[in-house]
Amino acid sequence: MELEPAAHVIEGMRATLFHNPTAGHKATKDDILAAMKLADFDVRYISVKDANLEEAFEKKADLLVIAGGDGTIAEVLTRLPDRAMPVALLPLGTANNIARSLGIAGTPQELVETWKIDNTHPLDVGTVKASWGTSRFLEGFGVGVFAEFLKAADKGEKAKGADNLRKGRALLEKQVKGAKPIELSIKIDGKTFNGEFLGVEVMNVPFTGPGLPLATRAHVADGLLDVVCFDAARRRDFEQWLEAPQDAQAPVTARQGKIIELVWADTANRLDDESYGNRDKKQVAEIACEKDKLKVLIPVKHPSQKAVAK
């Protein structure tokens, strides 16, 4: 991952903090504000539960900070009008797929101490054009089993932390076991693939769902999307992989491309962490990355931190 040269955060820098107060359980609003004020930020706090984001974006700031899970991060960044503004992530969710894909992990205090305003990495924004209009995403767009999994997860009681990841993977395994194969037409840069699948995910980052590395070749800023297909014939292999996804590559078929077209019917679709039902009606969607990329701050080690010798 190539980064721009580091520079110190400016004392008194104006930062707009978008916070989801219901995300996570280890860092409160006061914890985050204290960490940022300790680093000499002039902070304007906004709760994503109460705010009009468009109005909030109009306020001048030098840095935009998002504290929350993948849903909050995607909600704010896909609507950000000025992608030249640097953004910083404080991951407070369960999977934290977007932050994880950028190598960002830690408590708010640990992360704030490592921010350098010019140490950024670009992040693609995906776009979907379909009958409902145009939508943007950061993590992925898909149809079939993952979308049905999200619908089922919304109905269940939410656990916290690693326990939630474990329960999420168990629920996905249950969905995979009962998933009805669907006929899909997939076009990648003009080449068509037709088949019977449990689902397909068009991914912008390596991780999705309950912290699963499905698109290990994905690069967050190459303008390419990874098309991950769940072959009906490999259902049992995928069920077994979900029990220990850290031990092996996912048993999926993955291809890359710039312009993806999906044609499907009678199954749900998902956009990041939101799922939408679709029964009977044929849908056609074109998926690609937008030209303008986001600028995300990447943590840098403090000079006093030494690598541990092996």
What are these regions (language model features)?
Residues 142, 146, 201-215, 275:
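Glycine-rich phosphate/pyrophosphate-binding beta-alpha loops
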Residues 188, 194, 219-225, 229-310:
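ATP/nucleoside-binding phosphotransfer catalytic cores, i.e., glycine-rich phosphate-binding loops
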Residues 1-67, 74, 78, 109-113, ...:
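ATP/NTP phosphate-donor binding region
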Residues 157-166, 208-236:
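Gly/Ser/Thr-rich active-site loops/lids in small-molecule metabolic enzymes
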Residues 27-28, 75-77, 98-100, 148, ...:
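Short glycine-/acidic-enriched loop or helix-start segments at secondary-structure transitions
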Residues 15-17, 30, 35-39, 44-46, ...:
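Catalytic core of DAGKc-family lipid kinases
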Residues 146-149, 194-196, 207-211, 235-238:
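Short acidic/glycine-rich loop or secondary-structure boundary segments that cap or lie
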